[in-house]
């Protein structure tokens, strides 16, 4: 544990890194101890097969949690999975978890859900821990002050076998967001604004620490949304120092410490903040009060614009490579420069994902949907982030609000965030989505994705086009 009294001022990232450093070679290559390993069906089959071939066991099965999420249908699960490859991956994870003694939530377990929803929900995610998963949005767990990031399949095998990971240390960037968010502006708008400011490569080589009064004011769900999309800004991970909100969220969770162990953990957790005077390699500041509801218009998360804006003209971009890229984006999205964002009609709406599939997100969407009706030209689906989120939403009657308004109420899973299950866009369909990526084909071949907050997605589903949620009645 870092002795902050005698050491030079240290960042939160540096503290967690130093507490988990096993060995550092002369070239800066490090061996890092991993506290928690989350596993899903897509990036794990080859890793488990590698263990089997080498005759190895999972080093720490008690520190490994597996769940099926990417490929599961969100409709009737009593029927066979329509995609044979997906069915094989799901079956493989069940068998691998059984063989290697790993805790596993299958598609019929109410604890099942998107991997980055269930980790915090179960108390598997804890402040000051190192967390990895074969999934790029592992940065979500940084909302609790955990150093969390995605890894590749070969690294999944390495962590399963050794509970360590070979890494090189990143640089520190602090993003400070101060001020009060205006009504209708959310955590999703904060992170989209940050990505719009730094670009999708601006965080490359960095771990981002989010700070400031606007970040502190966010709920844990909101903080998870911000940290979730750190990777879209190019960063390795995102962090928020834990506080009373984080502790209250975790206390009593099934896998969280209890009794004297909780007290001991709290003593450590309360040291997890960047010291006054700690060095950051880069600093960025945003004024929360100046942020509008944001919509992406192109095929990169950095293509952000205010709901009151218009589609930009690539001809105004001096850099030729960037201009050509944005011209391609406009053509793919089927948009014309100068079109008002509020004039863009949609065909589909998706509310869910590891970015915005938690209870707070569903409450925000239900508040918009109550007493309204989904536009006749729009298909809209609500996909809870986990079985427990679904259970809570139904206890609050949110499902009835959505169904009465014409939304489809689904089972938990990654769903339309990515085209790896039955929920996907048809060519040229346009979607208001609460997910994290708007790349070409992300939600389906030739599908067109606009990233927005849950309230904005619900409003667009009802209006049939994007609207300013601040004016919603």
Swiss-Prot record:
Quote the catalytic activity from the record. Answer: (2R,3S)-3-isopropylmalate = (2S)-2-isopropylmalate
Q: Which GO terms describe its molecular function?
A: 3-isopropylmalate dehydratase activity; 4 iron, 4 sulfur cluster binding; metal ion binding
| Associated pathway | Amino-acid biosynthesis; L-leucine biosynthesis; L-leucine from 3-methyl-2-oxobutanoate: step 2/4
Signal peptide positions are: none
Looking up InterPro entries in the UniProt record yields: 3-IsopropMal_deHydase_lsu, Acnase/IPM_dHydase_lsu_aba_1/3, Acoase/IPM_deHydtase_lsu_aba, Aconitase_4Fe-4S_BS, Aconitase_4Fe-4S_dom, IPM_dehydratase_rel_enz, IPMI_cat
Gene3D superfamilies in alphabetical order: Aconitase, domain 3 (3.30.499.10)
- Keyword field contains Amino-acid biosynthesis: yes
Q: What is its EC number?
A: 4.2.1.33
Which BP terms from GO are recorded? L-leucine biosynthetic process
The family line of this record is: Belongs to the aconitase/IPM isomerase family. LeuC type 1 subfamily.
Cite the record's note on assembly: Heterodimer of LeuC and LeuD.
Biological role stated in the UniProt entry: Catalyzes the isomerization between 2-isopropylmalate and 3-isopropylmalate, via the formation of 2-isopropylmaleate.
Q: Write the protein's name.
A: 3-isopropylmalate dehydratase large subunit
Q: Which organism is it from?
A: Rhodopseudomonas palustris (strain BisB18)
